[in-house]
């Protein structure tokens, strides 16, 4: 009579053959025929085990067992042939030992002892059952929750210091290079000595309303003429250092700019806008008394730097999502700064047209040449003709780059109510257009 497994239970074969079981002898469990059946020259059959164990907890596993029973219903498990297939327990693996004819069933826990890294238990169970595994459940696994799982050793050359990648938790809690805490300005007391003219001149205006005026320093701090500020600029002033100094003076040594007005005007906005702070910073520098002295011209490299700052502020304002409703006061401030830059570039164009060498010692290299009026490109020093040609092309490019910006400002000004401020902005934009065309025409002559 054919033995059948109980419903919802795994069907597995006996560990020993029927002949050894009836004889109550130990079977060596060789497949396809054990040693005793080979000596007796009789077929070695393995019956279905009567003790099948507990039913599986997972319903899909039980359904797979029932489907396997239906597929093998026509076959007699008692008379299984040596070449036939047999079903094994799900928690065992089939390992090959010795020659190709000898097979042994080994437990999975014993074979996994030699592994260097242990896999996730949830993933192993899903692979054994054969179900679709959701990798979101791996986040709850203790192995993946450890910080070592996300740390990797970079392949560094010999002698280099080994680095490690930070975990996502560390990256989320860290302060990036673009965060407000890192981008905060430096304090005013830590300014270098060459920025003293900015610190002392503006500090009294910033603190005059809340505290007594500070005693101004003598001429050691505040330069009395444009030649002194030019000398300070020659001592190693770089564009990045100047930007840090402007930040420190504008923010009054605070960690972050004041954005209360921006957030109050846009309460539903989650982004912080620094456009107004940048425009105030630029206007404070342009209107500095040392740069606005009569009968004096700004250095060419200073004018190029301010033109680059103006262009970047224009780009930020036009692309800012918070500043979608452009303020006429912001446009007026940008027009004033742009007019100052155009005046400086027009002075350079006028000097080139008249043949004068009043470029203020424009230099493009880190180590300037001995000649004050030469341009150093790497190790080469340009002569007068090449210097004039390069300067002319550079000024022409900078002037033409501001033309579409002024056209955009004119379009934004048309949104205004048509009051006195809107009319003033229209007049300033037209004046800047006229100055740009005049400078370009002067350079073409």
From Swiss-Prot:
DNA-binding region boundaries: 17-44
Alphabetized PROSITE patterns for the sequence: ZN2_CY6_FUNGAL_1, ZN2_CY6_FUNGAL_2
A Gene Ontology term for the protein's cellular component: nucleus
Biased composition (Polar residues): 77-89
Source organism superkingdom: Eukaryota
Keyword field contains Glycosyltransferase: no
Compositional bias per record (Basic residues), positions renumbered to this chain: 51-60
Segments for region (Disordered): 50-89
GO molecular function, one term: zinc ion binding
Subcellular location: Nucleus
Entry keywords, A to Z: DNA-binding, Metal-binding, Nucleus, Transcription, Transcription regulation, Zinc
Role played: Transcription factor that regulates the expression of the gene clusters that mediate the biosynthesis of the host-selective toxins (HSTs) AF-toxins responsible for Alternaria black spot of strawberry disease by the strawberry pathotype. On cellular level, AF-toxins affect plasma membrane of susceptible cells and cause a sudden increase in loss of K(+) after a few minutes of toxin treatment.
PANTHER family for this protein: MONODICTYPHENONE CLUSTER TRANSCRIPTION FACTOR-RELATED (PTHR31069:SF31), OLEATE-ACTIVATED TRANSCRIPTION FACTOR 1-RELATED (PTHR31069)
Miscellaneous information on this protein: Gene clusters encoding host-selective toxins (HSTs) are localized on conditionally dispensable chromosomes (CDCs), also called supernumerary chromosomes, where they are present in multiple copies. The CDCs are not essential for saprophytic growth but controls host-selective pathogenicity.
Record protein name field: Transcription activator AFTR-1
């Amino acid at each position: 009579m054919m033995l059948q497994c109980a419903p919802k239970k795994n069907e597995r074969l006996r560990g020993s053959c029927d002949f050894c079981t009836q004889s109550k002898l130990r079977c060596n469990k060789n497949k396809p025929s054990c040693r005793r059946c080979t000596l007796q020259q009789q077929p070695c059959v393995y019956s279905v085990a009567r003790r099948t164990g507990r039913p599986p907890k997972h319903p899909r596993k039980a359904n797979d067992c029932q489907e396997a029973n239906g597929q093998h219903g026509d076959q007699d498990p008692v008379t299984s042939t040596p070449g036939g297939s047999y079903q094994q327990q799900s928690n065992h693996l089939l390992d090959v030992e010795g020659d190709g004819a000898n097979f042994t069933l080994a437990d999975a826990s014993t074979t996994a002892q030699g592994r260097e890294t242990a896999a996730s238990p949830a993933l192993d169970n899903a692979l054994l059952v054969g179900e679709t595994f959701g990798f979101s459940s791996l986040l709850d696994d203790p192995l993946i929750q450890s910080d070592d799982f996300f740390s990797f050793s970079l392949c560094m050359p010999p002698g280099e210091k080994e680095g490690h990648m930070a975990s996502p938790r560390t990256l989320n809690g860290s302060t990036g290079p673009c965060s407000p805490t890192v981008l905060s300005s430096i304090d005013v007391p830590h300014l270098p000595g060459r920025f003293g003219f900015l610190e002392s001149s503006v500090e009294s205006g910033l603190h005059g309303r809340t505290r007594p005026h500070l005693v101004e320093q003598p001429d050691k701090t505040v330069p009395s003429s444009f030649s002194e500020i030019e000398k300070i600029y020659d001592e190693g002033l770089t564009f990045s250092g100047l930007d840090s100094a402007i930040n420190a003076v504008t923010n009054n040594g605070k960690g972050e700019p004041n954005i209360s007005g921006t957030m109050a005007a846009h309460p539903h906005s989650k982004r912080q806008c620094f456009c107004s702070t940048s425009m105030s910073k630029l206007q404070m520098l342009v209107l500095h008394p040392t740069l606005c002295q009569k009968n004096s011209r700004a250095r060419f490299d200073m004018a190029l730097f301010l033109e680059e700052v103006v262009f970047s502020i224009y780009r930020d304002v036009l692309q800012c999502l918070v500043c979608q409703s452009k303020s006429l006061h912001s446009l007026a401030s940008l027009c004033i700064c742009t007019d100052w830059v155009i005046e400086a570039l027009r002075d350079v164009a006028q000097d080139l047209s008249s043949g004068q060498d009043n470029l203020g010692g424009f230099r493009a290299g880190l180590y300037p040449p001995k000649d004050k009026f030469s341009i150093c490109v790497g190790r080469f020093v340009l002569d007068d003709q090449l210097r004039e040609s390069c300067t002319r092309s550079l000024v022409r490019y900078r002037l033409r780059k501001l033309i579409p910006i002024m056209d955009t400002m004119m379009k934004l000004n048309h949104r205004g109510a048509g009051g006195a401020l809107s009319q003033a902005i229209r007049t300033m934009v037209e004046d800047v257009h006229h100055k740009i065309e005049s400078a370009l025409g002067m350079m073409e002559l």
